[in-house]
Amino acid sequence: MSIMKQRLPLGEFSSSKINKLAIANIADASEPRNHGENNVGTVCLPSIKSLMVSPEVYENTKSLPVPLMRSSGGGMACASKSSCQDGISTKTTSRDYSELSKKLQIRLQFAYYKYKTKQTDKNFTDLKSKHSITRPSKVATHSKSEPLTRRRKLVLSQGHYKTPARSKIKTPSSICSHDNTSSFTSFRGVSESSSTTADMNVADTTTPIRNNINTKHSNSHNRTLYQRQETPTSIKAAKSLIHLFTSNQ
């Protein structure tokens, strides 16, 4: 007989357990049977929730499905008992069911989640995009009106980029101010020492060289520069200072 005629109903689904499927009358009718030999093999499948909580590996189970072979009449017939046992032993030793049980557990968990949340018509990608955590984009510090200025990169002969180092040269204004202060202090100290040695009174008056100097900048803005120089009023004091600087003392 064919398998379609021997198909059995699924039975009742109770306490979240899969019904027991009975493989009956599959063997060929022409095959002789001994007295007391039962051809009905009952296969007990675990429940879905037990697979979700802790996946069991079917390595130590003895009730495995009976392997079927195609007979000459078009139906399915069971092989001999020795060949069936050999096939079962080789399958259990060669195949590892841990990876398959893990995949089945994940698929069952996902199907159970879709059933509970009533989202059976959606795919995994839709649910993933819905529950994915979106990180906020980095806000630019500069405004849109101001252009973003970036430092230029210098290209070497080998084609690599080199960022230009920051200039450590001081501006002329800072150099002039620093030199003026240092020269003024040194000049004043030397003038005081020379005045004590030469017994000459050097006045501390300030004689302006140029009161107002109007120069035009590149931006056409007039700037007024005030320059002042401290010079002694006595010619003898100036000569003594020149002699002091030129001497080896």
UniProtKB/Swiss-Prot annotation:
It comes from the Eukaryota. Keywords: Cytoplasm, Nucleus, Phosphoprotein, Repressor, Transcription, Transcription regulation. The modification Phosphoserine is found at S145. Induction: During G1 phase of the cell cycle. It holds the Pfam family Whi5. One of its GO terms (molecular function) is DNA-binding transcription factor binding. Residues 208-230 are annotated as: Disordered. One of its GO terms (cellular component) is cytoplasm. It is found in: Cytoplasm; Nucleus. GO terms for biological process: G1/S transition of mitotic cell cycle; negative regulation of transcription by RNA polymerase II. Its main location: cytoplasm. InterPro entries: TF_Nrm1/Whi5. Negative regulatory component of the MBF complex involved in cell-cycle-dependent transcription. The MBF complex is composed of at least SWI6, MBP1 and NRM1. Present with 2880 molecules/cell in log phase SD medium. Belongs to the WHI5/NRM1 family. This is Transcription factor NRM1. The gene is NRM1.
